[in-house]
Amino acid sequence: MLFRSTELSPENRGVGLVFQNYALYPHMTVKQNIMFPLENLKGVDKLTKDEMLERSYRVAKLVQIDELMDRKPHELSGGQQQRVAIARALVKMPRVLLLDEPLSNLDARLRLQTREEIKRIQRETNITTVFVTHDQEEAMSISDQIVVMKLGVVQQIGAPQEVYDNPLNLFVAKFLGTPPINVFEGEIKDEDLYIGNEKVLAAKGISDQPVYVGIRPEGFIYNPEGTLHLELSSTEVMGRDVSIVSRHPAAISPIVRSIIDADTVVSPTAENKVAFSLKPHKVFIFNKETEERLYPEVK
């Protein structure tokens, strides 16, 4: 592995690692686990016992476990064990911190709490941090820059909101978003976008072809005069919003989910259909073979 064009052995790379399995030494206390990397420092980096203790307590206080230093791993909760692992990675003052799915062993409440802690720690230490996760919500909430990968190949890099708003391909569009994007089979005819037999949007500049159409749940506007008709299955009240669950024969997934304002009164037709208009900036068109994004001309 090369760092700054210099071949370095693992202990000299300046990388702190935290994995899904925290790999704490069960026979050691929290203090001993955190101090362990410092005991292997050599040469000019070697520390005295007092220096190791001072740095270990400083890092423990940063991750808020300084009152747990005499406990052993089996006496800690999952969230506390995770903080010990982060402290052990930070104690060598790395140039880069790699977190490889560090939250996957925690329950939902602890995941949310620890996610905020990791953001705080990164801000306070200002260490470049690479956070690896399969959870798109974690990726969106914790990162300044997001890298979406598929089978080891980078699909898109950008700020989380930018990637969400402007996916380069269908994989990226489907990966980001809760609820997930709705995907339909569609067709471009005479520079118009059709879903089924309904013309839903203009698609100026795109040649006639079959396409995939991605519509974000918030991209629907309930409109009795709208051009896209869905078969209503149910509605779910979520406080300020209402989630409308419906179906469409051209939809790839079994259900179509749209999010609208809770004040909107939805009145299905006698055939149990609801009609929608679409927000153009929440609709994405993809080549059906390559699944790459197609861009209509903007007037």
Where are these regions (language model features)?
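Non-catalytic connector elements of ABC transporters
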Residues: 192-299
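ABC ATPase nucleotide-binding domains
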Residues: 10-16, 20, 24-171
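Short clusters of hydrophobic/aromatic residues that line enzyme substrate/ligand-binding pockets
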Residues: 5, 52, 294
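Short, small-residue-biased leader/transition segments that mark boundaries at the very start
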Residues: 1-2
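Residues that scaffold the ATP/ADP-binding catalytic core of kinase and kinase-like folds
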Residues: 8, 113, 166, 174-175, ...
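C-terminal boundary and immediately downstream tail of ABC-type ATPase nucleotide-binding domains
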Residues: 165-188, 214
